[in-house]
């Protein structure tokens, strides 16, 4: 949470320290463009890695594949930027991509930490990354008023954390040697492709109603909606921090045949996400107007009524992410694909109906309805998978996961 807060404060300081909004707009553009291709650079390998309970792949192979996807996504990102952005924005986009790339490399090392149940290493790393990159950005931008120089400072700060903290801690468990065969690269590309497409579909669920809102009501309405939505993002992030550390435990329980333990952990996780949502809804009901006024000024207060529907839609998104990731850990990539694609298809008609009827609130209603449709599909597949048990997992990965769980159980 510290890391995300520091990243968010970067967007605040670029406005506070500059004399206009040009650099803020350029930073927002770089974030948006890089975000499009970040999904392909990530290639959903984090969830796959931490649920690799038999250790079929080495950290070097995961790292090699991450470098491969980072390089490929960078080429695509820069081609897209060259076609859609002003020439002076290209360097900023490239630098911000490099900065985010360091974080994606660190994520692979965090996977090793999580597999070995050292979540404290991950927490310390995120704190170091967040604080160091924010301080680097503020100091350099304040001194130079040069956005590119400030992003370079963030890149250097993140790299220092990578080499001085994360790499040494990871190598306490496993030596990191980058390696990737053609066969392994093709295996990763093929296996995780449905999850990547599903992730792209999920990322578009709210983009569609937002774009329609801007088209029909105006960009000012979208700006208001996005500003009010900022505090509610804590629900999505809180949910990820809640279930993320459990994504290696779920497959162990499942492939060991411990259905009762699996169901109990699932129930606790769902209850936890609901609890975070309810707590945030109550807190923001009382301090939402004050928090929004503090962040964006008094002009935003009349739109505080948008907050509760946003909370509902954010919670629905969190459940879509959770059940999708859970099915990936159980090696049901196509089930995850189906749920997210259904959500994407559902949001299209819902967008026209909801935004036309409720304006800004329509974005929340359309997104929530689409996510809940996707969640229903994901739950259908999850119940089906759990009822059939691990013996019905199809494919080499399913067999490997079953064998790994048995080996781990016998070793204990």
What are the functions of these language-model segments?
Residues 1-11, 128-129, 133, 150-165, ...:
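Transmembrane helical elements of multi-pass membrane transporters/channels
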Residues 1-3, 30, 36-83, 91, ...:
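Membrane-water interface segments that mark the loop-to-transmembrane alpha-helix transition
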Residues 18-24, 82-96, 219, 286-315:
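Interfacial segments at transmembrane-helix termini and the short loops linking adjacent helices
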Residues 18-21, 86, 116, 143-144, ...:
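Helix-loop interface residues and adjacent transmembrane-helix termini in multi-pass membrane transporters
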Residues 38-57, 115, 228, 232-257, ...:
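Helix-loop junctions and terminal segments of transmembrane helices
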Residues 47-57, 102-126, 312-341:
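Membrane-interface junctions at transmembrane-helix termini in multi-pass inner-membrane proteins
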Residues 90-99, 123-172, 191, 229, ...:
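Hydrophobic alpha-helical transmembrane segments
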Residues 120-125, 147-154, 163-206, 249, ...:
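Interhelical loop/hinge segments that connect adjacent transmembrane helices in multipass membrane
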């Amino acid at each position: 949470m510290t890391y995300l807060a520091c990243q968010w404060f970067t967007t605040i300081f670029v406005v506070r320290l500059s004399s206009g909004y040009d650099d803020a707009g350029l930073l927002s553009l770089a974030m948006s463009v890089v975000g499009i291709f970040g999904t392909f650079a990530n290639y959903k390998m984090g969830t796959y890695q931490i649920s690799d309970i038999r250790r079929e792949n080495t950290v070097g192979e995961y790292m090699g594949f991450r470098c491969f996807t980072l390089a490929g996504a960078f080429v695509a990102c820069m081609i897209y930027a060259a076609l859609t952005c002003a020439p002076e924005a290209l360097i900023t986009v490239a630098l911000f991509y490099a900065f985010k790339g360091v974080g994606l490399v660190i994520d692979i090392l965090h996977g090793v930490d999580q597999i070995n149940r050292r979540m404290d290493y991950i927490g310390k790393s995120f704190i170091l990354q967040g604080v160091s990159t924010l301080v680097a950005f503020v100091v350099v931008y304040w001194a130079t008023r040069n956005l590119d120089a400030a992003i370079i400072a963030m890149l250097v700060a993140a790299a220092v954390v990578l080499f001085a903290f994360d790499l040494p801690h990871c190598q306490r468990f496993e030596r990191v040697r980058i390696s990737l065969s053609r066969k392994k690269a093709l295996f990763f590309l093929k296996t995780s492709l449905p999850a990547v497409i599903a992730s792209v579909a999920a990322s578009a669920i709210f983009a569609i109603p937002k774009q329609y809102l801007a088209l029909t009501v105006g960009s000012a309405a979208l700006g208001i909606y996005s500003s009010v939505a900022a505090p509610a993002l804590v629900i999505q992030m809180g949910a990820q921090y809640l279930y993320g550390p459990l994504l290696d435990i779920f497959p162990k329980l499942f492939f060991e045949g411990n259905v009762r333990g699996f169901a109990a952990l699932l129930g606790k996780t769902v209850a936890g996400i609901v609890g975070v949502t309810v707590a945030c809804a109550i807190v923001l009901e009382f301090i939402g107007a004050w928090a929004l006024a503090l962040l964006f000024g008094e002009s935003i207060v009349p739109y505080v009524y948008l907050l509760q529907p946003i909370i509902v839609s954010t919670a629905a998104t969190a459940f879509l992410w959770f059940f999708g990731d859970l099915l990936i850990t159980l090696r049901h990539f196509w089930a995850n694909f189906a749920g997210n694609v259904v959500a994407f298809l559902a949001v299209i008609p819902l967008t026209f109906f909801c935004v036309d009827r409720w304006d800004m609130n329509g974005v929340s209603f359309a997104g929530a309805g689409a996510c809940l449709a996707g969640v229903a599909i994901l739950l259908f597949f999850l119940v089906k998978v759990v009822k059939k048990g691990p013996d019905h997992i199809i494919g080499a990965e399913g067999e490997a996961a079953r064998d790994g769980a048995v080996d781990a159980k016998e070793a204990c």
